[in-house]
A protein has these predicted regions:
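Active-site loop of short-chain dehydrogenase/reductase
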Residues: 8, 88-89, 134-148
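Conserved glycine-rich cofactor-binding loop
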Residues: 9, 16-18
Length: 162
């Protein structure tokens, strides 16, 4: 299937594992250039190796950038490095972070803050930067991945469902 993604720059947060990794494989298969962002350089290196081995002719179309996206300045640095590698971001896929599962009796204001920092603000810190550039160009797409816990809160995942 040709989704017209050849040579488009796709930045994927949380791209070294799980849903983000699966998205990276799919975008690479469509010919996109993919920047992966994750906290762990080790996980990023492993993902790049696995993707290069599984998706034909993709090694030169993968860039990796380690950053804790809970820190806005590190999100900005990761974006700058990704743009230096492949130019403006055409598609942003946010798949980073997860809220800690906490039983209701252990919830505290800090648990709620931690959950918002882990999932919500990691997205906001990258979206804020990218959407301005996309708006100035008049094009681009942003996909925010939300798991089942973000749609319907369970008793032990209330902050993640907020």
């Amino acid at each position: 299937m040709d989704l017209k993604l050849k040579d488009k720059h796709v930045l994927i947060t949380g791209g070294s594992k799980g849903i983000g990794y699966a998205c990276a494989a799919a975008f690479l298969a469509e010919g996109a250039r993919v920047s992966l962002v994750s906290r762990s350089t080790e996980h990023l290196e492993a993902a790049r190796h696995q993707l290069s081995a599984s998706v034909k002719s993709s090694a030169e179309r993968i860039s990796i950038h380690a950053a804790d996206l809970q820190q806005p300045e590190l999100a900005a640095q990761a974006l700058a490095a990704a743009e230096a590698a492949f130019g403006d971001v055409d598609v942003l896929v946010n798949s980073a972070g997860a809220a800690r599962r906490t039983p209701p009796e252990e919830l505290s204001a800090q648990a709620w803050h931690d959950a918002m920092n882990a999932k919500f603000f990691t997205y906001v810190h990258m979206v804020d930067l990218v959407v301005k550039k996309m708006g100035a160009r008049g094009q681009g797409a942003i996909v925010n991945v939300v798991g089942a816990g973000g749609k319907v809160a369970s008793p032990i995942h209330m902050p993640g469902g907020a």
